[in-house]
């Protein structure tokens, strides 16, 4: 009996060791650990006033860009300021574009404002501009809806919170109070969440919200991150960061999403922006996620910006547009093209204004 007990203990220890060994290798593979960093620089300079990241950026057709800054205390990612987050606006048609802080009016606790993904919606009926902002006060997830009042004011209209919106990363607005949002994890506790990653459980999703209904619009995603919409409003794009893919869904009547395809990108990509003119898809990506989680200023996390041309076609083309080993820009999360210019935002570092010509 004692001998059998020893065998069982030894077998259990061996099984646990094997599982943790598998988990370590799996996480390293998903994180693209030790991946060779491609370098491709552009003519760029840092945007003034942006010192602690611009996690998401989006731009209107007239060149007015909105920036979400100061994300902190989120998923144990590095951050270097505990100050409340801020929103900025930037006129890309100005000869020297400079971010201007937006003044926020209304009943919103600015002391706990922690902005993440953003989206903008223009109501064609009266040209009103609505800004949707994912907010994480005290590590919660909610969506703030603002009306933009020229030229530097946001009027807070509404806070949206719902059990289905439990871990919102990004958002794409499709109406004045209507949006799709990604949940980037299933569990809030670290241990079970790591288990879902190790076991490749695709339990993340996209949620559709309107004042009339809230429901899952798409599931089966391992780690839903950035989300955006095609210029013709027909397709929704979702970045599955751990699968190193961009998932394409067709948007049908009744706000139903039907999976179409996935495009491999070979990187850990976050936010998605779409060129208003060409329809090209731009993504801010991480070359090696282990350098984010184990931040070392001597070996900083790099940045990669990629573009996908003809994403709906049978032969989409993925190209590297910018690459840096972290000594110019750390932890890129978003890239926004506009008439030969490019804005690049980051998780916690600075933001770049670049020329594509």
Locations of regions flagged by a protein language model:
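Blade/loop signatures of beta-propeller domains
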Residues: 15-42, 90-92, 191, 199-200, ...
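A short helix->beta-strand "capping" segment at the edge of beta-propeller domains
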Residues: 27-52, 97-104, 153-154, 315-326
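Blade-loop segments of beta-propeller domains
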Residues: 49, 53-56, 71-124, 131, ...
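Beta-rich, blade/repeat-based domains predominating
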Residues: 50-61, 106-124, 156, 162-179, ...
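Short, conserved, GDST-rich strand-edge loop motifs in beta-rich repeat architectures
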Residues: 67-84, 133-136, 181-201, 283-302
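Beta-propeller blade signature
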Residues: 82-94, 141-150, 197-211, 299-312
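Loop/turn-rich, solvent-exposed surfaces of beta-rich toroidal or solenoidal domains
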Residues: 230, 245, 265-322
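Blade-level signature of beta-propeller repeat domains, shared across WD40, Kelch, NHL, RCC1
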Residues: 329-357
